[in-house]
A protein has these predicted regions:
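Phosphate-group recognition and catalysis centered on beta-loop-alpha active-site segments
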Residues: 1-266
Length: 266
C-alpha cells in the first residue's frame, strides 16, 4: 500500500504537501476497477482507498433533472453497455439512474453527492472530469455547492476546460495550465502558475517542460492509461514513460489500476 490510510486528505493547494506525496496517485475512471467494482462506482472508490491512492478521478454527467451523477460509459452507446438499459443517461432522472445496477455487479450508478461524501470519509482527493454538454449555470452551481458541502475546496482539481466551468468553480478547484502559459514558460518567460497544474499524456510532456512548470509554480499530473498505447505494448511503453517522468521530477500520475504495480500497489 502506498498511502497510510490515516494520512490526511491531500491538499492540492500546498506545494509542500504535493512534494511530500510524490508520486501523487490518482485512480482513473473512478477508482480501482475489479470484478464487483465497475468504473465510477462507490465500490471502485472504496478500493482506491484500500490500495492507497491519494485521489480518484470522477466522471460527472448531468441527469435529466439536473443532478450531477457519475458515469463514463461507451461512446454513443448510452446506458446499454454498462447497465443493459436502452436509454441515454440524460433521458433519466437521478432517482431512476441510482436504481440501475451495473451489469454483472451489485453496484449502482452513484450521484456526485454520494461519491464526494465517500471520498471525504476515506480521505481521498478528487479529480473532476465534468463531461461536456449544455453545462448550465444551475448544474455547475450544484457541483460547486456539493464541493463546499463536503469540504473539498483544498483537495479537488478538474481536468475540464470548458469556458463556463472556471467562473462557476473558481474557488473550489484547481484548473490546468493553459497551452499558452505552458508555451510561455517553456520559452523562458516568467509566468505565475501557482495554484495550477499540468495535465496530459506522457508523450506530451518533455523533461524540459517539467522543469519549466516547476520553476513557475505549477505541478504536473500525467495520465498513464492503457488506451494511450498500442495493444501489444501497453505495459512496456507505460513503464518507460513512468521511469522517465519520475526521474524528471513529475509530481503525480493518473493511472488505470492495472498500472498499480508500477508504483508498489498490488
Amino acid at each position: 500500500m502506498k498511502r497510510d490510510p490515516d494520512e490526511e486528505r491531500i491538499n492540492v493547494r500546498d506545494a509542500d504537501c504535493i512534494r511530500a506525496r510524490r508520486p501523487l496517485l490518482v485512480a482513473h475512471r473512478g477508482g480501482v476497477i475489479a470484478a464487483n467494482a465497475p468504473e465510477n462506482s462507490l465500490g471502485a472508490i472504496r478500493l482506491a482507498a484500500v490500495h492507497g491512492y491519494d485521489m480518484v478521478e470522477l466522471d460527472v454527467r448531468e441527469a435529466k433533472d439536473g443532478v450531477p451523477v457519475l458515469f463514463h460509459g461507451s461512446s454513443g452507446r448510452g446506458l446499454w453497455m454498462d447497465c443493459g438499459v436502452p436509454h441515454f443517461l440524460e433521458e433519466l432522472t437521478a432517482e431512476e439512474l441510482v436504481a440501475l445496477r451495473y451489469r454483472a455487479s451489485t453496484e449502482h450508478i452513484a450521484t456526485l453527492a454520494q461519491a464526494l461524501a465517500l471520498c471525504a470519509s476515506l480521505g481521498l482527493g478528487v479529480m473532476l472530469d465534468i463531461k461536456s454538454g449544455a453545462l448550465s449555470e444551475g448544474y455547475l452551481g450544484r457541483i460547486a455547492d456539493l464541493l463546499r458541502e463536503h469540504d473539498c475546496g483544498s483537495s479537488t482539481v478538474t481536468i475540464a476546460t470548458d469556458a463556463e466551468i472556471r467562473p462557476a468553480l473558481a474557488d473550489q478547484v484547481l484548473f490546468p495550465v493553459s497551452k499558452e502559459d505552458e508555451a510561455r514558460a517553456c520559452e523562458g518567460e516568467a509566468v505565475s502558475l501557482e495554484g495550477q497544474f499540468w495535465f496530459g499524456w506522457a508523450a506530451e510532456l518533455p523533461n524540459a517542460t517539467v522543469a519549466a512548470l516547476q520553476r513557475n509554480g505549477a505541478f504536473s499530473i500525467v495520465s498513464i492509461n492503457t488506451f494511450h498505447y498500442p495493444a501489444h505494448a501497453w505495459q512496456s511503453l507505460a513503464r518507460q514513460d513512468i521511469r522517465r517522468l519520475m526521474a524528471a521530477g513529475v509530481e503525480g500520475f493518473q493511472i488505470d489500476s492495472v498500472y498499480g504495480d508500477c508504483f508498489g500497489i498490488v
